[in-house]
A protein has these predicted regions:
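Alpha-helical multipass membrane-protein architecture
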Residues: 2-599
Length: 599
């Protein structure tokens, strides 16, 4: 089912013998992957979010390669693809490995385990999505808002006439971000809540140029569904739970509402994403099976297919071989952690299978809300639940060994999910500018492997320098690591009890009802459709993000459609780019020891 959105994928511009995968581009991409990966590791531990590195890397690449001379748009695109892989590996690492510290791990994080598991997850995520590229980008035409924005930045670098609206949008969003994070004179969010009898009702709005731009790019239909999920969470679920569970015990209504959201309502989104992932894979089953069938035929040598450069992927034989190497790596590490041979083998195979499921979900979500807003932690919670339950059924009851095995196993799939979203985002950018998928797939894999080798030292430096709040490592200015705390909490809850299974099941049932309604609407030819995933995202993400995305989409609906590359779309893309650049710059200032805000 194709999405109707503000932006539709353009046909890639054919180029003959393009200058794309070059030694200097690879070297620059790796350097940026390490730098931006480190910056995002800090941001993720500090604030629980990461910024897509694609646009900052594209801007840096255009500036440096222009000075060197002879650069092409495809070479710059390849650089940003390699660089953004470092950010994706950082996202997977910061959400999981610090959870070991929270659970009581002493000393530095083990280099071999972090490196091997990050590399295994990065390889899975970078390559498994090759089988989904055509289904998501070409056939379903998901908007990939940040992929579109990055493509517009690259095009503007080639065509200076497009630079003005892009620059204005970027300057306004960057200025707003600086006013918030650097100078502290503008709030990043406005929120409020009030008691209505025993119920509490509240809401928030994020003040963000990037989110407004994303809303404009994805269009009113998708943004409305995301907003509907958030509105249901805050206007229905939270008030009802407050009535049932006595939310009035907390005198501050906003604190009470936020506590209910984080401890209960957010798990509605987890359940909904689980059902949504299953439904999405079921709907795409024919396309996926066709891609796998053709791939197996190519591997066996019984089928040879000639395709255009813009449709050339890595060979299925290479993909199967590379992903296959991750299985013995995971098996060996599980053995080292004390699991038996049978359990280690079962875990390795299970993670390979779950890896494809997680990459499919994460890639789809990125296509809707962009790489920066991809709810990787939600996908990781689903994986952790599956792994932890499997370990309990296998007899691993120890609250020490069980959670550790679950977290390290989940780290593989978490990194794969983050990498999948990034990889499809890069492939979407490549589709918009006429790049070769095969070159991008190689580049993303290079960036993922390179970043994996430095993740353990980066994490250990940050933990040694700042510590993690609420643990034995904590000190002044300790890192909050909110996603790692979520992962640790969920894992412990499976082994010790206390996970809100009823809420998770309710989210899954709600999504099933939506799916049934969508099937009926399709059968009767209705133009009203409600796919699950956008609603699930709204249930899981903070409401303020959904509200701002919705406002951006409303603005686009009010102004009306415009042709691809129009000034308003360029302005929206510039807002996404400007905030991303300022976010990285702010992270660099904080990492350098500058105390923010300065006022």
């Amino acid at each position: 089912m194709a999405y109707s959105c503000a932006v539709q994928a353009a046909s890639p511009a054919p180029l003959s013998a393009p200058r794309e995968l070059t030694p200097r581009g690879i070297a620059l991409g790796i350097a940026l992957a390490l730098i931006l990966g480190a910056a995002n590791a800090y941001l993720g531990l500090y604030a629980g979010l990461t910024v897509s590195a694609s646009i900052p890397a594209a801007v840096i690449s255009m500036a440096l390669l222009r000075m060197a001379g002879g650069a092409t748009i495809l070479e710059n695109n390849l650089v940003q693809a390699i660089a953004s892989a470092g950010e994706a590996v950082a996202a997977g690492s910061i959400f999981t490995f610090p959870a070991l510290i929270i659970l009581g791990h002493k000393g530095p994080l083990p280099y071999l385990q972090v490196t091997a598991l990050s590399a295994a997850g990065g390889t899975m995520g970078a390559l498994l999505v090759v089988f989904l590229r055509r289904a998501y980008i070409v056939d379903d035409r998901l908007p990939f808002p940040e992929g579109f924005a990055c493509a517009e930045v690259l095009r503007a670098g080639e065509n200076r006439s497009q630079m003005a609206p892009l620059a204005w949008g970027g300057a306004i969003a960057a200025g707003l971000k600086a006013a918030q994070d650097v100078f502290g004179i503008v709030p990043g969010m406005i929120s409020g809540a009030r008691w209505l009898g025993g119920a509490v009702i509240g809401g928030s709005i994020n003040i963000s140029g990037a989110l407004l731009g994303i809303g404009y790019i994805v269009g009113l239909r998708i943004a409305t569904l995301v907003f509907a999920g958030g509105a249901f969470a805050w206007m229905v679920a939270i008030p009802v739970l407050a009535l049932l569970h006595g939310g009035g015990q907390n005198p501050d209504p906003m604190r009470a509402a936020s506590a209910l959201w984080s401890s209960q309502v957010r798990y509605l989104g987890v359940g909904a994403m689980l059902t949504g992932g299953i439904v999405t894979l079921w709907r795409l089953r024919k396309r996926i099976f066709a891609a796998l069938r053709d791939s197996l035929a190519i591997v066996s040598g019984s089928h040879v297919q000639v395709v255009a450069r813009e449709e050339t992927d890595l060979s299925p034989r290479a993909i199967v071989s590379a992903v296959g190497l991750t299985v013995p790596v995971i098996f060996t590490l599980c053995l080292m952690l004390g699991a038996g041979v049978a359990l280690s083998a079962a875990l390795a195979l299970m993670l390979a299978l779950i890896g494809f499921f997680a990459t499919a979900i994460a890639g789809y979500l990125t296509g809707i809300v962009g790489a920066s807003n991809n709810p990787v932690s939600g996908v990781t919670v689903i994986v952790l639940l599956a792994v932890a339950i499997f370990l309990k059924l296998a007899g691993v009851e120890s609250v020490g060994v069980g959670p550790r095995l679950a977290i390290l196993s989940g780290a593989v799939v978490c990194t794969a999910a983050a990498m999948a979203g990034d990889s499809l985002h890069d492939l979407a950018t490549g589709y918009f500018v006429g790049a070769t998928p095969r070159a991008l797939e190689i580049g993303v894999l290079i960036g993922a492997i390179a970043a994996s080798f430095v993740m353990a030292p980066i994490l250990n430096l940050l933990i040694a320098g700042y510590g993690i709040a609420g643990t034995a490592t904590s000190r002044a200015g300790a890192l909050a690591a909110p996603q790692a705390f979520l992962i640790a909490k969920v894992t412990q809850a499976v082994f010790r009890g206390g996970l809100p299974w009823t809420t998770i099941a309710s989210g899954a049932m709600l999504a099933a009802l939506l799916a049934a309604g969508d099937v009926l609407a399709e059968r009767f030819g209705s133009s009203w459709r409600a796919p699950i995933m956008p609603v699930a995202i709204g249930l899981y993400l903070p409401f303020g993000l959904s509200v701002t995305i919705f406002i951006g989409a409303l603005t686009g609906g009010w102004l009306g459609q415009e042709k691809e590359g129009g000034p308003r779309l360029l302005f929206a893309a510039g807002m996404v780019a400007g905030e991303a650049l300022m976010g990285v710059a702010t992270g660099a200032l904080v990492t350098a020891g500058v105390s923010l805000p300065v006022l």
